[in-house]
């Protein structure tokens, strides 16, 4: 087993997972339990019902044009004149349908709470769900941006930021956001080969792997969370950000895999570092798990002018296949200031790159360069997330905004926390409780678990017997359970990451029992060796 693991040690945890699955699935008489991936097995149904019902209304709106050809399935573009009245009739005639009731409430919320033009909203939704026009503006549809922006500001704890000061770029999930941002930072000279980038560790593996690619060749500086501090960043680690050689700080908040939000002390520490030492520091925060946290506040809320926020709808709404996300930027930000401070020769080169977009290239904001770069600049006029995707994103946002009691959120939190309690109960340990814990994942610290079960001496022996990777292969081989190695996420502790989102409660009970059984067998082996000494 050791030889097998060593040959695969350089793989990303997500690629290593496939090898672990092969081993865990090798026994046809045993259930394979894959706790390695974060794809949730829950999803929001109401905004999806609304999406499909809206599609039926939109198709009928299309057929108001070219009605003489509807027998062969030809429709035209939706018309805004009278659309509100026709929609209200549709609602009245189909009020018994859950998705339709939600659409009716959405229209009321958009009109009465957000103060948006109801006809313009309906026309954008109908036109968007039909997918019959290019996304205009390419960055994001106008009304969809206003709706999603309200959701982002609320969920990221950024209520102090005026909504109109935030720009959004709708993207194909967090994956696309990361790829676009790294590439535009390089293309615009904001990150160059050899530059130092700080990375909050442990972290989602691509944040470690992307800077190491030859096309970026960045020098990584680890900002290490401390497991003894419940995975918070010590002040001494955050103080590394004072180094003027560090250009940007990448972090996932709440973290992945520890699944802990940054506490108020850490947020204030970063705020003070930026204010007193590093007003030029660029920050990129990926806050996809923020909606699972209690009283969450993003670095974007703390340092809005220094921070690019990446948010994906994938986990909270069970929408990994939809590929929905946004990049948020404050209108006054250090990314634009850094562009202004480039050498004249670099500015001239960028003038040439973006010359087809507008006469005054130097007024082009970084977020708009992201849009252009995402389509090789020349195709900027056809850039943008598909309009049906933007409609679903807007409906997800309205679903959360109208749920003022946060019933959906509380239900999901209870679900994943019950799963964690069940896993650790069967393992024979109390669940890991912390006010900053999010519990979407749990990082099972193999050294800590073995020490608590059978003492420090056994724990030291068990860790010496095999590497973490070997142990995870053994777990897969003997129990059929797939965990991802914590070390692959930048953790310095021997650990395995288990997602608490993608299996059912009884399956987490089985995982806990299987891990406990394996620990008992290891202890019996250890005890036998001790007696023979």
From Swiss-Prot:
<feature type="modified residue" description="N6-(pyridoxal phosphate)lysine">
    <location>
        <position position="315"/>
    </location>
</feature>
<feature type="binding site">
    <location>
        <position position="256"/>
    </location>
    <ligand>
        <name>L-aspartate</name>
    </ligand>
</feature>
<comment type="similarity">
    <text>Belongs to the class-I pyridoxal-phosphate-dependent aminotransferase family.</text>
</comment>
<dbReference type="InterPro" id="IPR004838">
    <property type="entry name" value="NHTrfase_class1_PyrdxlP-BS"/>
</dbReference>
<dbReference type="GO" id="GO:0042802">
    <property type="term" value="F:identical protein binding"/>
</dbReference>
<comment type="subunit">
    <text>Homododecamer.</text>
</comment>
<feature type="binding site">
    <location>
        <position position="115"/>
    </location>
    <ligand>
        <name>L-aspartate</name>
    </ligand>
</feature>
<dbReference type="InterPro" id="IPR022518">
    <property type="entry name" value="Aspartate_4-decarboxylase"/>
</dbReference>
<dbReference type="InterPro" id="IPR015424">
    <property type="entry name" value="PyrdxlP-dep_Trfase"/>
</dbReference>
<dbReference type="GO" id="GO:0047688">
    <property type="term" value="F:aspartate 4-decarboxylase activity"/>
</dbReference>
<keyword id="KW-0032">Aminotransferase</keyword>
<dbReference type="GO" id="GO:0006531">
    <property type="term" value="P:aspartate metabolic process"/>
</dbReference>
<keyword id="KW-0808">Transferase</keyword>
<dbReference type="GO" id="GO:0004069">
    <property type="term" value="F:L-aspartate:2-oxoglutarate aminotransferase activity"/>
</dbReference>
<dbReference type="Pfam" id="PF00155">
    <property type="entry name" value="Aminotran_1_2"/>
</dbReference>
<dbReference type="InterPro" id="IPR004839">
    <property type="entry name" value="Aminotransferase_I/II_large"/>
</dbReference>
<keyword id="KW-0028">Amino-acid biosynthesis</keyword>
<feature type="binding site">
    <location>
        <position position="497"/>
    </location>
    <ligand>
        <name>L-aspartate</name>
    </ligand>
</feature>
<dbReference type="InterPro" id="IPR050596">
    <property type="entry name" value="AspAT/PAT-like"/>
</dbReference>
<keyword id="KW-0210">Decarboxylase</keyword>
<keyword id="KW-0456">Lyase</keyword>
<dbReference type="GO" id="GO:0030170">
    <property type="term" value="F:pyridoxal phosphate binding"/>
</dbReference>
<protein>
    <recommendedName>
        <fullName>Bifunctional aspartate aminotransferase and L-aspartate beta-decarboxylase</fullName>
        <ecNumber>2.6.1.1</ecNumber>
        <ecNumber>4.1.1.12</ecNumber>
    </recommendedName>
</protein>
<comment type="function">
    <text>Bifunctional enzyme that has both L-aspartate decarboxylase and transaminase activity.</text>
</comment>
<dbReference type="GO" id="GO:0006523">
    <property type="term" value="P:alanine biosynthetic process"/>
</dbReference>
<dbReference type="InterPro" id="IPR015422">
    <property type="entry name" value="PyrdxlP-dep_Trfase_small"/>
</dbReference>
<dbReference type="InterPro" id="IPR015421">
    <property type="entry name" value="PyrdxlP-dep_Trfase_major"/>
</dbReference>
<keyword id="KW-0663">Pyridoxal phosphate</keyword>
């Amino acid at each position: 087993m050791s030889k097998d693991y060593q040959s695969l040690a350089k793989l990303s945890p997500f690629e290593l997972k496939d090898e672990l699955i092969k081993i865990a699935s090798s026994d046809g008489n045993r259930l394979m339990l894959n706790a390695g991936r974060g794809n949730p097995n829950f999803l929001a149904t109401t905004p999806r019902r609304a999406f499909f019902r809206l599609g039926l209304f939109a198709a009928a709106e299309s057929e108001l044009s070219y009605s003489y050809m509807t027998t062969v399935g030809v429709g035209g573009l939706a018309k805004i004149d009278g659309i509100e009245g026709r929609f209200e009739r549709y609602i009245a005639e189909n009020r018994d349908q859950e998705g339709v009731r939600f659409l009716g409430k959405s229209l009321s919320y958009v009109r009465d709470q957000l103060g948006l033009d109801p006809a313009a909203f309906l026309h954008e939704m109908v036109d968007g769900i039909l997918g019959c026009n290019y996304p205009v503006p390419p960055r994001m549809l106008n009304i969809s941006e206003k709706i999603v922006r309200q959701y982002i500001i609320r969920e990221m704890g950024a209520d102090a930021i005026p909504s109109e000061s935030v720009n959004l770029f709708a993207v194909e999930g967090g994956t696309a956001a990361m790829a676009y941002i790294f590439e535009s930072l390089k293309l615009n000279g904001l990150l160059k080969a050899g530059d130092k980038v700080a990375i909050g560790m442990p972290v989602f593996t691509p944040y470690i792997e992307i800077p190491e690619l030859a096309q970026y060749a960045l020098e990584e500086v680890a900002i290490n969370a401390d497991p003894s501090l419940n995975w918070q960043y010590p002040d001494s680690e955050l103080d590394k950000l004072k180094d003027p050689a560090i250009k940007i700080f990448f972090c996932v908040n709440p973290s992945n895999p520890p699944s802990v939000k940054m506490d108020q002390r850490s947020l204030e520490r970063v705020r003070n570092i930026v204010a007193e030492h590093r007003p030029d520091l660029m920050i990129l925060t990926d806050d996809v798990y923020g909606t699972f946290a209690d009283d969450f506040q993003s670095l974007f809320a703390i340092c809005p002018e220094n921070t690019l926020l990446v948010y994906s709808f994938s986990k909270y709404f069970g929408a990994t296949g939809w590929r929905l996300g946004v990049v948020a930027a404050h209108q006054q930000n250090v990314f634009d200031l850094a562009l202004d401070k480039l050498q004249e020769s670099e500015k001239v080169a960028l003038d040439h790159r973006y010359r087809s977009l507008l006469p005054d290239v130097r007024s082009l904001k970084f977020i708009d360069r992201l849009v252009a770069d995402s389509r090789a600049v020349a195709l900027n006029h056809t850039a943008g997330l598909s309009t049906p995707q933007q409609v679903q994103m807007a409906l997800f946002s309205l679903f959360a905004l109208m749920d003022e009691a946060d019933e959906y959120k509380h239900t999901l939190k209870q679900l994943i926390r019950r799963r964690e309690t069940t896993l650790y109960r069967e393992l024979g340990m109390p669940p890991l409780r912390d006010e900053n814990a999010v519990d979407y994942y749990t990082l099972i610290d193999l050294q800590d678990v073995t020490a608590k079960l059978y003492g420090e001496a056994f724990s030291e022996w068990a860790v010496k017997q095999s590497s973490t990777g070997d142990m995870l292969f053994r777990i897969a081989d003997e129990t059929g359970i797939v965990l991802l190695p914590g070390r692959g996420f930048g953790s310095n502790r021997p650990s395995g990451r288990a997602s608490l989102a993608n299996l059912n409660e009884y399956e987490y009970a089985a995982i806990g029992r299987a891990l406990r059984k394996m620990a008992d067998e290891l202890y019996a082996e250890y005890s036998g060796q001790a007696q023979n000494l």
